[in-house]
Amino acid sequence: MKRELDYIYIDNCIGCNQDWLPEFDMNRGGCAAVTACDLCMYLARLDKFEDLFKFKNLSRENFIKFAGVMKPYLTPRYHGIDYLEIYLCGLGDYWRSVNYNIRRLEGLAGSASFNFALEAVKSQIDLNLPIPYLMLNHADSKFEDFEWHWFMLAGYDELDDNILVKAVTYGEAAWLDFKALWNTGCERRGGLIKVLNNF
């Protein structure tokens, strides 16, 4: 079974594109803030909560402005936003600043079993909710473009003997082997962020 979210598009790109950001630190290391922008834009539409994204339309210009709003909450740093807790605190602070309490955030560490992660991904997508995902190092070079990077998951495809996830980053989407993605073969791992209902 294949499930894909009705995701946001800007200038024919799926999601926000980090390459559009003019500030050097955000252009090079703003991936956490970019995924937070994606998530807020998506939830503002889904939950009809305009204060999450206080701009009239989805455009490159408004994304750049919104990234500037998000930057103080998820400021790029030397080692990146490399712990789920930093992301949870930063985005949680932004949500509180706009009085968004319809949903809450919860992390699932990369040390969790694949089955737990698979259940989390499927349940989130089945609820029409995208997933911020952090990957640190990976032993398989085919994932090198996703190393030390935050990106979004916006779909899954269950095959007979495998499951693929739809990864969204830099305005593009790619279908990835989720079991291989999750099992990095490295000691330190990232994880994913679940978006849960408060009511």
Region spans (language model):
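Noncatalytic regulatory segments and standalone regulatory/sensor domains
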Residues: 144, 156-199
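Alpha-helix capping at helix-to-loop junctions
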Residues: 45, 93-100, 127-130
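Extracellular-facing segments of soluble proteins and assemblies that are Gly/Ser/Thr-biased and enriched
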Residues: 61-117
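Active-site-adjacent substructure of cysteine-protease-like catalytic cores
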Residues: 111-165, 198-199
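Solvent-exposed loop/turn segments at secondary-structure junctions
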Residues: 38, 137-140, 171-172
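Non-transmembrane alpha-helical segments in soluble domains
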Residues: 40, 92-95, 122
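Active-site-adjacent structural segments surrounding the nucleophilic cysteine of cysteine proteases
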Residues: 1-86
